[in-house]
């Protein structure tokens, strides 16, 4: 530890006047471990804490802001300050937060007031987190102050839910007993947020509201003795009884909403779906306290009111997701079968196979709203399935094939067509299909090769390929350009047409600027789906070629855009090389050219296959044969010499006779190795017979062509090279040796004179 450092008292004196970079330098200096010293605790560090408390209690908002940040830094990096003065600093910050909350409307009117609220809340949260799990500090400094901090945070959560709800959620999870007196107050605040302001909240804040509502069920409900049944007293009480009560209450509120959809679609046409709807859980009258949502007000004369159906289902799905996905201090019982049945019912609410009610008034506005809300109702089932599969994995393995079959209902088809996908509707459901592909990827990772190729996979491939293209917003404008021009000529409004031309000039001159490009997260999900499909199935030729085209073109575009090919596309190219399917042409050369700057071991091995070196050098390892081995070597050498001498003696006469008739004969030099000859006389006899037959068949030709004939000219004279070898193949049958010799090598035809033939007969 360095002995020379800035005194804490010096830093404390400069805190009041420090601004900007000077204040940042002081905070960075206080993080040094040299100040963690008991000798400094009573004098220097106590003086620093006094200055910090002075800043926090100051009426100046900037001094308050500096005091909050300084207290957080010193408590986080100096355990001595946290242990001795942490409770004092927390109480000071909380008191200022309580004061500011009383004047919330006036404080929040300025921009720095919003930032000050954010700083106060985050400072309280950080110091609480620093004190947790420290027994003495938590018992003596934190818990007594939480009873005063929690009411203020609950009040403030009505105005700043995004800032306060994470803090309350951690307190509710860790200090459940301390939070118990304030449960009803917090429940009221959450219900007001759900009923009145839920649709106007952001996605993150909506999730926080639902999670806090679920964590309220960690507290056990004290049931009065009058309502208890003495006959049920012997039953086991589970730790998650209150949690399960809340879960089942939310789950049972889906059925009335789905029954309202029965006024739009005729459920009686599908008996299985009708029975499944009846089997859904119903709200128990004894648990009416859990039902706090108001009833829906729908009017078919005002079709836009039908949008309340998917909005209510989305709210219930968010709350159910919180109950089945949040971590709890005890194991919980989740009705996976009931949730799966609910999702099947939601996916079945579709006009794909169910007709509309005959009593409905069929007008364009009502039909348009119905066609829009039905996919959103189905999407809530897909969301629940995604959470169930991601959290519980193979626990729902028995449901996976049914899930894939139900997903097919979500893919829109054109009316009065033979399973032709309606890509116009698909384009408007891009966000929903991203969730579908995440769900399918998780399911296929558990199933894989157990599945045969099914229609839903082929349809999802078509959807993925369509959505992988960048969406051009002005395609419809160009398609209807002629009709627009005709309308303009009929109206003859010159001034409006000129202004319209000026407004539309960018559309016609720079159409590439009106394009919605896909994100990398979308490409990653699509590529994972394609990789799974290629690994597990042999796709038909058309979709397989389309996937190849997609991977190559998008890789080139992204390489030009980012300077490199993303990892998901590298994995897709590797998968396409390893699984070519029924295609005969491999994309290996294209993939290598795209990934030439990437040292990929797989592509390197495919281009330059190598035998493991460790297996090669052992093949030629010399063996120590000893004296017996040397004797065997001598015997083998002698046998080879005798075989060579006998073979030379047998072929000597024929070679001399062939040398006398070399005037018009070209002697071949064989291109391959000389075959192993067993009996030369048999070959000469066979060759002479073949030569006679060939002369008779080719008498009309001027030249006789012999197979593998070459002229060997070595200076002044011709030299015939004849190599004969005798090996172990003498033991093979004569017929096999003749066939092999005929295929590998042919002896040139040699014409003998009549005198020489007579001499042979006399001999």
UniProtKB/Swiss-Prot annotation:
InterPro entries: RIX1_N (IPR012583)
Free-text function comment from the UniProt entry: Component of the RIX1 complex required for processing of ITS2 sequences from 35S pre-rRNA and the nucleoplasmic transit of the pre-60S ribosomal subunits. Regulates pre-60S association of the critical remodeling factor MDN1.
Region of interest: Interaction with IPI3: 2-233
Keyword set, alphabetical order: Acetylation, Nucleus, Ribosome biogenesis, rRNA processing, Ubl conjugation
Stretches for region Interaction with MDN1: 663-763
List of residues that carry N-acetylserine: 2
Biased composition (Acidic residues): 736-763
Compartment list: Nucleus
One of the GO BP terms on file: ribosomal large subunit assembly
Protein name, entry field: Pre-rRNA-processing protein RIX1
Note: Present with 7820 molecules/cell in log phase SD medium.
Protein family: Belongs to the RIX1/PELP1 family.
Entry comment on modification after translation: Sumoylated.
GO CC annotation, single: nucleoplasm
Any one GO molecular-function label of the UniProt entry: chromatin binding
Region (Disordered): 722-763
Organism from which the protein derives: Saccharomyces cerevisiae (strain ATCC 204508 / S288c)
Record carries keyword Amino-acid biosynthesis: no
Quaternary structure and interacting proteins, as annotated: Component of the RIX1 complex, composed of IPI1, RIX1/IPI2 and IPI3 in a 1:2:2 stoichiometry. The complex interacts (via RIX1) with MDN1 (via its hexameric AAA ATPase ring) and the pre-60S ribosome particles. Interacts with NUG1. Interacts with IPI3.
């Amino acid at each position: 530890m360095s002995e020379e450092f800035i005194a804490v008292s010096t830093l404390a004196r400069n805190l009041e006047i420090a601004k900007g970079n000077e204040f940042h330098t002081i905070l960075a200096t206080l993080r040094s471990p040299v100040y963690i010293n008991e000798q400094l605790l009573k004098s220097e560090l106590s003086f620093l804490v006094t200055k910090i408390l002075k800043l926090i209690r100051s009426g100046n908002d900037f001094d308050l802001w500096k005091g909050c940040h300084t207290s957080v830094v010193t408590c986080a990096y100096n355990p001595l300050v946290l242990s001795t003065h942490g409770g004092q600093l927390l109480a000071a910050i909380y008191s200022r937060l309580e004061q500011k909350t009383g004047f919330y409307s006036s404080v929040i009117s300025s921009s720095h007031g919003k930032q000050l609220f954010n700083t106060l809340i985050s400072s309280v949260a950080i110091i609480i987190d620093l004190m947790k799990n420290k027994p003495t500090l938590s018992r003596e400094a934190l818990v007594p102050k939480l009873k005063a901090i929690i009411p203020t945070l609950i009040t403030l959560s009505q105005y700043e839910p995004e800032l306060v709800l994470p803090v309350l959620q951690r307190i509710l999870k860790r200090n459940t007993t301390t939070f118990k007196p304030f449960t009803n107050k917090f429940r009221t605040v959450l219900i007001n947020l759900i009923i009145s302001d839920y649709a106007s909240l952001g996605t993150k804040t909506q999730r926080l509201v639902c999670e806090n509502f679920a964590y309220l069920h960690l507290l056990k409900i004290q049931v009065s003795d009058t309502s208890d049944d003495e006959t049920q007293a012997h039953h086991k009480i589970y730790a998650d009884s209150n949690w399960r009560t809340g879960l089942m209450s939310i789950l049972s509120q889906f059925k009335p909403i789905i029954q309202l959809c029965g006024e739009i679609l005729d459920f009686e046409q599908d008996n299985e779906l009708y029975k499944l709807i009846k089997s859904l859980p119903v709200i128990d009258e004894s648990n009416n306290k859990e039902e706090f949502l108001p009833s829906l007000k729908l009017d078919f004369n005002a079709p836009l009111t039908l949008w309340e159906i998917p909005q209510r289902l989305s709210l219930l799905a968010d709350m159910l997701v919180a109950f089945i996905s949040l971590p709890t201090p005890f194991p919980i019982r989740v009705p996976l079968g009931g949730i799966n049945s609910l999702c099947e019912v939601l996916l079945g609410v579709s006009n794909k196979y169910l007709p509309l009610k005959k009593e409905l008034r069929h007008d364009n506005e009502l039909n348009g709203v119905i066609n829009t809300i039905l996919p959103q109702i189905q999407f809530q089932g897909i969301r629940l399935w995604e959470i169930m599969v991601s959290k519980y994995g193979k626990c729902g393995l028995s449901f996976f094939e049914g899930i894939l079959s139900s997903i097919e209902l979500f893919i829109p088809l054109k009316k009065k067509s033979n399973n032709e996908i309606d890509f116009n509707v698909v384009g408007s459901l891009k966000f929903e299909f991203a969730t579908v592909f995440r769900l399918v990827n998780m399911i296929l990772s558990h199933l894989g090769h157990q599945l045969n190729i099914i229609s839903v996979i082929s349809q999802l491939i078509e959807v993925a390929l369509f959505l992988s293209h960048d969406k051009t917003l002005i395609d419809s404008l160009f398609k209807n350009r002629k009709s627009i021009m005709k309308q303009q000529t009929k109206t003859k409004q010159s001034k409006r047409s000129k202004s319209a031309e000026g407004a539309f000039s960018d559309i016609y001159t720079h159409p590439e600027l009106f394009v919605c490009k896909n994100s990398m997260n979308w490409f990653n999900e699509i590529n994972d789906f394609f990789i799974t499909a290629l690994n597990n199935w042999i796709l038909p030729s058309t979709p397989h070629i389309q996937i190849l085209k997609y991977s190559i073109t998008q890789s080139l575009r992204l390489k030009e855009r980012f300077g490199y090919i993303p990892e998901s596309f590298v994995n897709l190219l590797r998968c396409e090389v390893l699984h070519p399917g029924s295609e005969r042409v491999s994309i290996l050369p294209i993939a290598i050219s795209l990934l030439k700057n990437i040292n990929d071991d797989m592509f390197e091995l495919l281009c330059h296959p190598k035998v493991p070196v460790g297996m090669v050098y052992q093949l030629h390892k010399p063996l120590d044969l000893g004296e017996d081995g040397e004797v065997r070597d001598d015997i083998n050498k002698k046998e080879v010499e005798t075989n060579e001498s006998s073979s030379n003696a047998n072929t000597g006469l024929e070679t001399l006779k062939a040398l006398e008739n070399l005037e018009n004969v070209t002697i071949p030099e064989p291109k391959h190795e000389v075959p192993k000859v067993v009996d030369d006389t048999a070959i000469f006899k066979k060759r002479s017979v073949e030569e006679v037959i060939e002369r008779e068949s080719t008498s009309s030709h001027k030249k006789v062509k012999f197979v593998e004939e070459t002229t060997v000219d070595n200076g002044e004279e011709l030299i015939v090279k004849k190599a004969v070898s005798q090996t172990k193949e003498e033991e093979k049958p004569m017929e096999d040796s003749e066939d092999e010799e005929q295929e590998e090598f042919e002896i040139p035809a040699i014409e003998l004179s009549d005198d020489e033939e007579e001499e042979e007969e006399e001999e």
